[in-house]
Amino acid sequence: MLRIPVRKALVGLSKSPKGCVRTTATAASNLIEVFVDGQSVMVEPGTTVLQACEKVGMQIPRFCYHERLSVAGNCRMCLVEIEKAPKVVAACAMPVMKGWNILTNSEKSKKAREGVMEFLLANHPLDCPICDQGGECDLQDQSMMFGNDRSRFLEGKRAVEDKNIGPLVKTIMTRCIQCTRCIRFASEIAGVDDLGTTGRGNDMQVGTYIEKMFMSELSGNIIDICPVGALTSKPYAFTARPWETRKTESIDVMDAVGSNIVVSTRTGEVMRILPRMHEDINEEWISDKTRFAYDGLKRQRLTEPMIRNEKGLLTYTSWEDALSRVAGMLQSFQGKDVAAIAGGLVDAEALVALKDLLNRVDSDTLCTEEVFPTAGAGTDLRSNYLLNTTIAGVEEADVVLLVGTNPRFEVPLFNARIRKSWLHNDLKVALIGSPVDLTYRYDHLGDSPKILQDIASGSHPFSQVLKEAKKPMVVLGSSALQRNDGAAILAAVSSIAQKIRMTSGVTGDWKVMNILHRIASQVAALDLGYKPGVEAIRKNPPKVLFLLGADGGCITRQDLPKDCFIIYQGHHGDVGAPIADVILPGAAYTEKSATYVNTEGRAQQTKVAVTPPGLAREDWKIIRALSEIAGITLPYDTLDQVRNRLEEVSPNLVRYDDIEGANYFQQANELSKLVNQQLLADPLVPPQLTIKDFYMTDSISRASQTMAKCVKAVTEGAQAVEEPSIC
């Protein structure tokens, strides 16, 4: 099997600067001059010919080269002529030398590319009309621009057996040109050595050697980086052509990272979801749940208002009847008799509208499903509940301590950043919690929360590692805060972070304390003053309970009085809707322009890609209409006015794609000393231990047939998933 060794043993890679692992930063005086088609350009020593050409805007054709992967140099499509050199060179792998004149469009360069393209097409099936890559295929584009206009190959073409690597990625291996991008992505970015090559020459094949599922939460990205149609999306197969779809730039809400995405739609239906570049968040990758769970947007949807009748059955009704029923209850009960719970997929506009509505009936019992300790600093200080170092900041860290989290399946793109830094920057990682299968080596310190006390006191050996670190990070998973001793865990982590700042070489602007959230709405809800957890509702059960997309099962009918009136507003008939007396159908994230705040405190917007199904409406509009019928009209009629209200309550919520720094760690640590709670002996066990736990975590992914197939393939094998035969 071909393997690209990219471990720290590679000299030079570990010292590479952020963003590009193949160039070496030098002083300006050390720049060297080269010429590209006679045009002068100053570059750093070690820059490749291809990078020098791109610096002057000259695009060199390539198949195997990718900016975020190691150099393979095996497709030879990037051959260029160097003046006075005896042979053409591979631009992606050849470092420039002073005074070189690179000829990108000489006759020798053109002839070399034509020859390479002719060899690549010799065994290619040329089945573009039935290939899902058609219209966005590098092989199509480059054969058009750099290939010959006819073929001299008259022999029989080879055929390669397709591989079954799971329900997400479709393989047509006869189209494969052995660029090895997928292999390098799996080994370097995903950290899963499942893919490789067997055979040599004409018999070379890319595959898993033993037929098995490609076990990665980032597997769908090999579809994007494949330059031909060898790897395509199984759920998307034969459904649309790229020029038929409308593309909408948006963000993902399946986790708390806020990955930037492109939603492709046709005839009012989401056809597929692709990644969008954002260097500070997801780079150009997205998780499989982000990419493939979109079919859950078409199933189990709430499309019309519903009311529970005298027989106890939910029946369809009109908006007027449903809103009048809810308004009547709000007029009958006020104050502590009215409460609300916000779920994990709720946007900031709906959160502020619901807050204003309940405040107008003299209620402040607004809760989130996720628990966050309120003892000590609680949620009063914003730096106490953010990933303060930022996602991209991981690349600057030299030590990371993970506490009670499995970032690989809770927040895959954050985990990919940790692996990137571990691979190239000698990052040292340690974990307190259940041992999990991460994509990098780490020191397992144990699973007892009491280890935190030992580290804080300095008696644990790892205390010295943190003390010697220049840029340490302590990352506490939000799942650990759901425990009964969550406040004590938070206080212990805060103490560790503050002692590191005082005793190590940490500079003033480096932030050690970090909270890693799992759901998209939590940070915005805390910014708006929602109470974390539903304990207040359990202690004082209300007469009217508003469930805003609350499908986490944090509260049941048994927790409430029999006469409690429950309103569910959301987009899926999942956990919350069956217990409701009135259902108000809302819009999903692809159907509204809405604000979400990710785990690092960065506000971003989703955009309208399709209209909500049936009679469903945007959440803030439903709440606004309800307030008018109830006689407590909210003072906004448009989205801009709602966002003005957001700005009044929490200005950072409308500073899009910007992170407002928070630095109250010393104050938070002082307040944490007031926490009167003991750490329990129970081990720290994150809820998502294996990849099986990754696929179905919210109302959208639980409604997805594709995600259900993934769970079945993981538990029973890829062969257990029956795929429809397409002729």
UniProtKB/Swiss-Prot annotation:
The modification N6-acetyllysine is found at K84, K467, K499, K709. Its main location: mitochondrion. Its EC number is 7.1.1.2. It is a peripheral membrane protein. Keywords: 2Fe-2S, 4Fe-4S, Acetylation, Electron transport, Iron, Iron-sulfur, Membrane, Metal-binding, Mitochondrion, Mitochondrion inner membrane, NAD, Oxidoreductase, Respiratory chain, Transit peptide, Translocase, Transport, Ubiquinone. Residues 245-301 form the 4Fe-4S Mo/W bis-MGD-type domain. [4Fe-4S] cluster 1 binds at H124, C128, C131, C137. [4Fe-4S] cluster 2 binds at C176, C179, C182, C226. Pfam families: Fer2_4, Fer4_NDSU1, Fer4_Nqo3, Molybdopterin, NADH-G_4Fe-4S_3, NADH_dhqG_C. Residues 30-108 form the 2Fe-2S ferredoxin-type domain. [2Fe-2S] cluster binds at C64, C75, C78, C92. Its cofactor is [2Fe-2S] cluster; [4Fe-4S] cluster. Residues 1-23 form a transit peptide. One of its GO terms (biological process) is mitochondrial electron transport, NADH to ubiquinone. One of its GO terms (molecular function) is NADH dehydrogenase (ubiquinone) activity. Residues 108-147 form the 4Fe-4S His(Cys)3-ligated-type domain. InterPro entries: 2Fe-2S_ferredoxin-like_sf (IPR036010), 2Fe-2S_ferredoxin-type (IPR001041), Mopterin_OxRdtase (IPR006656), Mopterin_OxRdtase_4Fe-4S_dom (IPR006963), NADH_UbQ_OxRdtase_75kDa_su_CS (IPR000283), NADH_UbQ_OxRdtase_ferredoxin (IPR054351), NADH_UbQ_OxRdtase_Gsu (IPR010228), NADH_UbQ_OxRdtase_Gsu_4Fe4S-bd (IPR019574). It catalyses: a ubiquinone + NADH + 5 H(+)(in) = a ubiquinol + NAD(+) + 4 H(+)(out). Binds 1 [2Fe-2S] cluster per subunit. One of its GO terms (cellular component) is mitochondrion. It is found in: Mitochondrion inner membrane. PROSITE patterns: 2FE2S_FER_2, 4FE4S_HC3, 4FE4S_MOW_BIS_MGD, COMPLEX1_75K_1, COMPLEX1_75K_2, COMPLEX1_75K_3. Belongs to the complex I 75 kDa subunit family. Core subunit of respiratory chain NADH dehydrogenase (Complex I) which is composed of 45 different subunits. This is the largest subunit of complex I and it is a component of the iron-sulfur (IP) fragment of the enzyme. Complex I associates with ubiquinol-cytochrome reductase complex (Complex III) to form supercomplexes. Interacts with MDM2 and AKAP1. Core subunit of the mitochondrial membrane respiratory chain NADH dehydrogenase (Complex I) which catalyzes electron transfer from NADH through the respiratory chain, using ubiquinone as an electron acceptor. Essential for catalysing the entry and efficient transfer of electrons within complex I. Plays a key role in the assembly and stability of complex I and participates in the association of complex I with ubiquinol-cytochrome reductase complex (Complex III) to form supercomplexes. This is NADH-ubiquinone oxidoreductase 75 kDa subunit, mitochondrial.
